[in-house]
Amino acid sequence: MSAQQSRFTRLPRVPRAIGLVAAAATLALLAAGCTSGGSTGSTGANGYGFNAPAQVKDSGITILVDAGRQAIAEAFKADHPEIKVDIQTYDGNAGGTNSFQTKISLADKANSGWPDVVWSGQVNDASWAAVGKNGAQAFAAPLDEGVTDKGWLDGYTKGAEDPVTVDGHVYGARDNLAPVVFWYNKTLFDQFGYKIPETWEDYQALGDKLAAEHPGYTLGSIGDSFTAVLADMWSAQAPIYTVDGKDFTANFSDDHSKKMIALLDHMLANKSLSLDGLFTPDFPKNSKGKLLGIPGPTWFTGALFQNKDSLDGQPGEWGAGAALHWAGEDTATGNVGGGFWYGSSHSTNLKAVGEFLQYATSGPQSVKLITGLPAYASTASDWLDAQVSGGFWADGDDFKSNVAAAATHIWSGWGATLSFSSEPAWNEVVAPALAKGETIASTVDAWQKRYENDAQVNGYTVK
């Protein structure tokens, strides 16, 4: 996800209830255990089903997190005084920076300095972290080989761990799911007498009506790559990039791709969509009290609606509608982020690593501190119940059912496990054109070519 999720989500607030979804460290300071390089083996070592180093019972662990995940790491440290915990922050691999892989590559070269646990806001890191390279042992430990409690991984929502499952082994613990729903301002919908859209066609028609009757009000923004590409194109089942093993396809001629590009261009033209970045000062300045609705992931709860520095919503003002879909087609939606925790195969205290991973995703503080819909099924159920009982959301029962349903309708045709970030293509090709008043449609050839070039550079065969 998304990058913005990692970078900007603040710990949310819920009035009188459980809280909601919300300086790079140098490798020289990372005090993790280390071994000589080698490939992960199925024969196991030191009690684990892989080539683990000798375990040291009292060895401390280093946890590398972004600002949004620091609270859960601090909670673990407070609740486990018997474990020496060093918490260090970095950008969370946000925005396709590749900082996670860069740090691990440097540690591999030095043969020391690996963190014991790393948070990443991206969903594709298993493509490299679970694979040994140039004689170096794969960084990510297979969690199902003794790191986590037996059977614990079975508690995940179906499909949540698919992006980190490689050759039958699970290499990461998913923090949250980030399915896209339609967020609506109930206060404004009631005031204007509008009906909440159910389809993309409804959404476009509502944009026309809003532009004509209430100029200055909007139905969202595509000022960020993740809103346009992940929230909109993915939700539209637009196959602008798909992967099958090492085969890559960018299909901009598919009807779903063409329809969504036309929809976005149309709504930009009538100004029912803006180009404000959601985490820039312009967004709250221009959108607070004037945003009728927006398609977006579940972590918008804390990042936008319950963030005093953003929309600063009030109880009963915002609700979650069903995921938008094309008329006459099955419901499908996109996913924006929902990052993973990785344990290091080099750690000398894998017991503590496993305890942290389970604590962070399904422990006693996870409902309060996970910044989005938790990926662990029992935690997700408790989180949804907390939203309804907290009283913040309009139409609480609809909130619960619509968010839960969206989590089961994420479109599987998207290239979610792409080994490189898709964000630079939008940021460097499409966004500058839009800033000059050009259309998305006018950039399609260059946009597609950028994806194909990036794919080739990263070892894919372009089909």
Task: Name each model feature, range by range.
Residues 258, 267-272, 309-375:
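Extracytoplasmic/periplasmic substrate-recognition and gating elements
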